[in-house]
Amino acid sequence: MNLTMHIFLQGCWVGRAVLNPAADGLLSLQGEVRDAFGWSEEADVLSASEMSQQFLKDAPFGRPEWESTTRYSALLRLKQSICSAERLVVVGAGSESIAVSDYPGTLFVAADGAVGAVDDLTKVLCVVSDGDGAEHLERAAQSGVHIVLHAHGDNHDGWLRLVEAWAQFEHPPHLTLTHQANVVLEGMHNPGGFTDGDRALCFIHALGRSLEEIECVGFRTDVVGQWSGTTNPERKKRKLAWMKESMRRLGVEHHLIR
């Protein structure tokens, strides 16, 4: 990248957001969730601040591909792909296995481990993840799928371990960084939402794609989906109730499996 382009992209990053600001209701939901579970916003801020600082370095984790200007360019390309997709399907943890051949002309966005439901990763535009998608997330990262990686108070060690591992790949995935704190952090975004599933919808919405033009599969609150990470089932159902509320505020509650 020449110096002129570097300065141009750096200016774009600082002066023009790729994501539209999240609605107040989607951001306030994050505080409501913290209150409901007794979580501290300070922990969210600490994890996200560490992520921001790590990725502001030259060649973060030894990878020039993860510098701010390169991540900005990758996010612009992702935005174009999401907004121009003729048919866009968002895959949640309750999805059955998906044969891409049954969805001609379709591109996918997956919520964390739900990427494992899709049999052709070349059709997956990105995975929205807080890092607990296990082998399914790992396979997507190894395949070069763009990862929208989320920092929160309970996953600091997890996201750090993942990026250290991905940095060893010959071709590491493109990264976009998100958080859920009421702060502004350089190089990161807060699209709103709480679970990987509803955060994926918030992310798509923030990029400018109308949620009236998308489809959802595997979004349900009655059971814990097969693609969810290891979790306490009852606690997970409480989290899924908040996913439902987030989807209600987005106006897409009708996408839930009843």
Predicted stretch roles:
Residues P104-F108, E212, V252-E253:
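A generic structural motif
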Residues W66-S68, S81-A85, T106-L107, G113-R209:
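Acidic/Gly/His-enriched mid-domain segments of enzyme catalytic cores or analogous surface patches
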Residues V183, C216-G218, R235:
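Buried, small/hydrophobic-residue-enriched core segments of structured protein domains
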Residues T176-L177, E213-G218, H255-R258:
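A structural signal for short, well-ordered beta-strand segments and their strand-loop junctions
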Residues N2-L88, S95-S101, V224-R258:
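N-terminal donor/sugar-recognition subdomains of glycan-related enzymes
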Residues V89-S95, D112, D196-G197, H205, ...:
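Glycine-rich anion-binding loop/nest that anchors nucleotide
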